[in-house]
Amino acid sequence: MLLDKLSVLSFLGLAPIFAAAQLSGSVGPLTSASTKAATKTCNVLDYGAKADKSTDLGAPLASAFADCKSGGLVYVPSGDYALSTWARLSGGEAWALQIDGIIYRTGTDGGNMIYIEHSSDFELFSSTSEGAMQGLGYEFHADDNWSGPRLLRLYEVTDFSVHDFILVDSPSFHFSLDTCTNGEIYNMAIRGGNHGGLDGIDVWSNNIWVHDVEVTNKDECVTVKGPSKNILIESIYCNWSGGCGMGSFGSDTNVSDITYRNIYTWSSNNMMLIKSNGGSGFVENVLLENFIGHGNAYSLDIDSYWASMSAVDGDGVQLSNITVKNWKGTEAYGAERGPVKVVCADGAPCYDITIEDFAMWTEEGDSQWYSCESAYGSGYCLQDSDDHVSYSVTTSTVSSAPSGYSATSMAADLTTDFGSTVSIPIPTIPTSFYPGATPYSALMANSASTAAASSIASHATVHSSSASVAASVPSAVAPSESIPAATSAVVSSAAAIAPSPAVGAQEGSTTSAPSFAAPSGAGNSPQGPTGASGFGEKGQQGEQGEQGEQGEQGVCYV
């Protein structure tokens, strides 16, 4: 239900310390949704919207935003809405978008169905954890059209969160974070078709925390593109997906301080793919920790000659200081696609690569291989030398399982994909994303009849788990799941004590944001990440849309 500004009280969230060294500062909105609603509430029904699944929501949503963009809450109540003209919501400050209804795509234009740009102190959420966008992408895909609209894109948004929201069956990408800063994404379910080009979450931004998200598709699960810095991605459930990755990378790559932690991958193309083909620049300071996989084609796949993208001019992207730690589980067929593949550019050999506590075994057959090229560091086929010169592919084959490879499975592992030419049902958001890990924030719908408010603090305070408010109740008590156990703390000028996350917490160091240079060409928006040709299109109003990746289309390796 709509936030009752008279009965719902905000609380000051005790946020985690910088959740890992990869976060450089606070994430999440600066004020709670209840505070914004108390300032002003703009209900789309008052602007001409109708929950009849046929009246266009586009104009009412834009009008409601215009009235609340300077401080307030835009409210889409429960019900079924049609969106035939896309909503470009630009220039908001201290505002929230509460979508408790389901928005169905009825238009056919390209671009982005909901595009939020140049905003600060922003929150998008569903108080029922059931709000959704249904892209009905199968209507495009049945005609072999893979370049329809994206569902949701944020561009140059600062101090924000998106949570308790569902994205289904996008004609193209589902969710893009483009040149954003200080954001938190959590408690989401994304379900797309079984085909390349239907990315789950793509991030090219600075100081972003993505956690507790499930993705089903056959391309990117949660992927970092360039330029990016200070990105923490954890508790991700790639449930019959393409898998998590980084790239594809081309010229002038600038990516650093990236952590993937607690990643569960089932029946996907890979557990982690770092991809490029030529190009220049660097990827450095990467931690890939606590991965569990079953039934995937590839496990660790670092490929600097990735054949699914056209070669880019340059000696190659320089990869360095990458740690792969605590990987368990099984791959589909290790004799055909081994669990360790580290192929670096001959013109830019990678170095300081560490693979430790890594135990994977094949589900089919009785052997598997490890393969390296121009790769230096420690573990498996990596060469240990200070002379980082190129060398040819070296492959070793083993015929006995490593000790300790056995790993648990998730009860919700899908038994089949959803295809790409029939309607995909809207899922519920799960309450478990990685075996044994409790989500950082309870679903708003499951908050024990409480209202979890966003942290209210100065920008210097570390924010996190920034759930706004759920059902109307006389008082608000934070759900126990929303605040991890305290281990150490940072005290801000507001004297807020910040417990750290339960896994691998450490104090983060503040670093400068990467430079996001505007490209030449139409419009003033930035150039998106460079990818293989296939699914990108020019966006709206002169926007230079990011180029999509073709991926391994329709491939299922199990």
From Swiss-Prot:
Enzyme Commission number: 3.2.1.171
Signal peptide: 1-21
Keyword Hydrolase: yes
One MF annotation (Gene Ontology) recorded for this entry: polygalacturonase activity
UniProt-annotated catalytic positions: 219, 294
Glycan-linked positions: 145, 239, 254, 321
UniProt protein name: Rhamnogalacturonase B
Gene that encodes it: rhgB
